[in-house]
Amino acid sequence: MRYTIGLSAHKESTMQSHELNTRIISRGKEFFAAIAGEKPSLFDKGAWMGKVMDWCMQNDQFKIRMFRFVDVFPSLTTSRLLTEHVREYFGKEQEMPAFMATGAKMAGMLGSLGGAVLNRLLTSNIEEMARQFIIGENTREAVKNLERQRRDGFAAVVDVLGEATLSEEEAESYTTTYLELLEALKQEQASWHGLPGSGGDPDLDWGHAPKVNVAVKPTALFCLANPQDFEGSVTAILDRLRRIFLKVRELNGFLCIDMESYRHKEITLEVFRRLKLEHPDYPSLGIALQAYLRDTDRDLDSLLVWAEQHGVQISIRLVKGAYWDFETVRARQNGWEIPVWTIKAESDAAFERQARKILEHHRICHFACASHNIRTVSAVLELAKALQVPEERYEFQVLYGMAEPVRKGILRVAGRIRLYSPYGSMVPGMGYLVRRLLENTANESFLRRSFAGDAGIEQLLEDPVVTAERERAARAARPKKERTGPGGLSPFRNEAMVDFTRLGHRDAFPAHIARVRSLLGRTYPLYVGGREVATNDLLPSVNPNRPSEVVGQVCLADTKEVADAIAAARDAFPAWRDTDPRTRAEYLLKAAGAARGRIFELAAWQILEIGKQWDQAYADVAEAIDFLEYYAREMIRLGEPRRIGHSPGELNHYFYEPRGVAAVIAPWNFPLAISMGMVSAAIVTGNSVVFKPSGLTPVIGWQLVELFREAGLPAGVFNYIPGRSSVMGDFLVDHPDISLIAFTGSVETGLRIIERAAKVHPGQANVKRVVAEMGGKNAIIIDDDADLDEAVPHVLMSAFGFQGQKCSACSRIIVLDAVYGRFIERLVAMARATRVGPAEDPGCYLGAVADEQAQQKINDYIALGKREGGVLFESQLPEGEGYFVPMTIIGGIRPEHRIAREEIFGPVLAIMRVNDFDQALQWANSTRFALTGGVFSRSPEHLAKARREFRVGNLYLNRNITGALVERQPFGGAGMSGGGTKAGGPDYLLHFMDPRVTTENTMRRGFAPVEADDDWVE
């Protein structure tokens, strides 16, 4: 009986849904009929912009070049730069529209005069393009255009352009701009008549709505907004947002908190909730939600329940979302679930579903429908009618400069429409402009399909649920790209990065830090031949941020214990060498699984023992897992003998075998990742290992013992022997049974190892091989057209992440003269906003350095830098204990200065000023190191030149230069940075093995078996 009732109710619901959809389609057809023959100005081919849009829709490659050119355009401040970039971006005349071809030709014929003509032409047209979407560059322009809009019957939401500011000065400027705009609107709104509506207060728009309505982007209010520091970000954003809100309230206006990238979604929701509870009786405070996010159904339900519980009125502006490409790419790069719907119709269906939910709760939630989609607008109108929603509880919004026929149509049928009107200068407006251009030229854009495509009205008005189901079915029917890894394993994928948008990840760090802290102070033995070995010589390991806190103490090996470990490894080697490569790989995969299950705990050990920040510590563990997973697959691939040569009558096989006992000497800065990388490479290739961890991170080194023990690795294959380098270092390197040495550390130590390994000792049967990764003096070039919004935070991250204690860290910035002043101003301002303090505090950007010796060395280099150049910035240090040094930026440095040549391994950045890009490359290549480097440029020719001439092992273009990922960015350099090996790359394991060849004569009495790939004479 219950089933029958349920079925009946479902049938009735389906019928109602069908009837509603019929009404939506009918209204949509009426809408299209009312605007027949009209076209948005964007698609008017008689105008410059319309021609450009038409070219973009016809040619994807031109679209990419055009939008990138628009992005770089504000930085092209001279005729020379402009002419060069037109040539670089568009090249041949037949590849560009006529106006550009004419201008380029004129520039070529007339030299600087032609360049000036081209400059004026492009400037005029691109500024016209920007004005299409931006209501004004200053308050006067904005107010004038707002008044014009109101005369046409349109209200407005004003948004100051800018997001993700880089400094507190920029955040304060953004806040001040809002306050000044609001003050100007306060003077003007008194003269504005309320837009006509169905009764109510004539001094309000439509009788019920504030005339002043602004939208604010939270990330513009705090330059270091970051979900890792969730509470600090929320608090800092609110500090400035309150000032804007109080000014809005003074005007009896409306404030909407914009939703930006998914990364900041939870911060934005929390900011809204807190501000609303501070002013529970003020109704004109809202938040934007993005229908294309998979979380939005849940977030909407949560907000509505929260509003009910607290008895407050809220307002929601529902948008589709404008960062689809960014969110998709970022999620894939980091190994996260994609947060957005991947089928356009799914976003449309979600919008209608969420619109219904809001309209059903109109008693507590005002609704702003922000869409140009006629199907969506028709659905909202019909839903509101069916649910008997009062007119004052919902309105419509469209973007300024877009979809003029749609906004006029909405004005006719609903009367309540706002234009979302960005305001500000062209430079921050370029990002917004490019997003709008992408939106309008996308194949799935409703406006393009409606006004510049051939989609029929029935297709445009189809129920998006039906469209999405059809697309999902079509995707399911397509042939799947089956990818398998070596030996039938799944393909290698990097371990997902920590996702601080997830509450579980944010909460995991304090919990695991507390748990690990409860385990501090233990004593750790040696691990030799599968047995724990205690010694009386103990070394305490301390927290560099709190040296009085002992993380643990380890037993130290003397030469006797080292000899015992080498003997255990030597005895284990024959059986391990003969173990099938697949079986050896399985041990690595088991260790990877064990590490994955303890990933937050292992990160917590790094936070406390070596002072890594939360994200840095997690990334170190993830990289260790990557090495295990990747090298396991690589050994399976390399473990199969490969036939070489195809001459009939013989079989030649090429294969590899291990070298013997490997000494692995690890650094402290990546105590799990690099240690695991070198150890796992040696083990999986069939060598047995004697592992010496750094004396600064021996407790983390012990974690390798636990992981391999959990994996069931045979006794003697892995041996753990912490000890003083002065006591055991040379003994380990010189020992005749050592066949291979894997080392990561300083140049001085690396060269000493290479020198000693070259000497043959009595009883030695192998020429020792050294796999050494040493130091770097890495440079980033800032070109004269660089995007400083990108360059500044990436430079800061590259130079000061983990206190600059990475061999890949940036220690030199080479800046072209044309942008020097602007770059330095913004870099110093962002550095000034950071905080120095304990690494376990997520609000601290810079923590303590490794130990007192490192502290003294870095301070000595800072003093040297002050003598060789001039200090541009030096941070304040926290009070109390800890090996802290200031974040320091030193200007006026040249290639001959020691500060530009010697590796410091700390948060000290040298700034070098050059005239042109060629000089920048020359200076970048002027050291004896060749590890990493970077270039920030939007010149295709300069990027190509850097690829050819910037001679480093890892070159990064338009991104930070640290954080190389296994497989994607195999890591290692040449010169004095190393021997050219690439950790995490396809040839790294070869350095741990010797190649062998077997040749068999298959001819017997004149008969030879035929192999499938033999080269026979036809």
Model-identified regions with their sequence ranges:
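Short, positively charged and aromatic/hydrophobic N-terminal segments
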Residues: 2-11
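Conserved C-terminal structural/oligomerization subdomain of aldehyde/semialdehyde dehydrogenase
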Residues: 393-396, 438-448, 545-554, 571, ...
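Hydrophobic face of amphipathic alpha-helices that form TPR/SEL1-like repeat modules
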Residues: 443, 452-551
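Positively charged, amphipathic and often flexible ligand-engagement surfaces
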Residues: 12-494
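Glycine-rich loop-to-alpha-helix module at the N-terminal edge of alpha/beta enzyme cores
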Residues: 547-639
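Rossmann-like NAD(P) dinucleotide-binding subdomain of oxidoreductase/dehydrogenase enzymes
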Residues: 607, 637-790, 914, 980
